[in-house]
Amino acid sequence: MTAATQPATPAAPNNNEPVRVNHTARNVIITIVVVAIIAVAAFFGYRAFAGANESSAKGSKGNPVKIGVVGATNPEWVKFKQDAEKAGIYVDIVDFQDYTSENPALDSGELDLNEFQHLLYLANYNVSNKKDLQPIGGTAIYPLGVYSTKVKDIKDLKQGDTVTIPNDETNQARAIGVLKAAGLVTLKGYWTAFSTPAYIDEAKSKVKVTPLKAEQVATTLKDPTIAAGVINNDYVAD
């Protein structure tokens, strides 16, 4: 299997992106759909999927396939594990609170696979860290949304409001694309897959942007000084 390669830079989002509003018991969720196909990544090197005998073979009861995810208790993983065992493959779903730890864990041999990232994130990780993790398949398509407990409609955000976004390089750029599509920020030039807050023209933008670790963005919605946050699907809970 060949090494992961840098995918083509996606086109800049436009102001006609669909906006979906989902009212829940605890939160008003304002979702601007900027999707990513989540890839399953693996490291094929000195570790092999099969051992010398059946008792130690990778996928056996004594040596399950370890898959790193965020949200191991989600219903889909319970069903996946059950179906895998019916097929004779034992799986250990390893939960991570911080998805930035998953690729290092895969590279070190703590995991056999992980499932959390889109291809751009994986390619950027490989290039930045001189690694060779392999994408072996796509699993799901997730939106990146704007969430708020303060307003019911994205149009209700006020001039000067603060919006938090993930600070990892590729998801930060996606979040900026979401805010641009919603008309909340104006960029100094074109949006790219590696746009940073430095690309934002603060004087012409409606909101202020604060980058934080992805797992912290959702908790900022409880802060009275934060109007909204762009939250990765892994950290969204009703």
Model features per residue range: what roles?
Residues A48-K66, A84-K86, D153-D161:
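Immediate post-signal peptide segment of exported/extracytoplasmic ligand-binding proteins
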Residues N124-I136, V151, D238:
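Ligand-binding "clamshell"
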Residues V91-D98, K188-F194, K206-K213:
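Short beta-strand-to-loop elements that line the ligand-binding cleft
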Residues Q82-D83, T100-D112, G177-V178, P197-V230, ...:
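Short helices/loops that flank or line small-molecule/ion binding pockets
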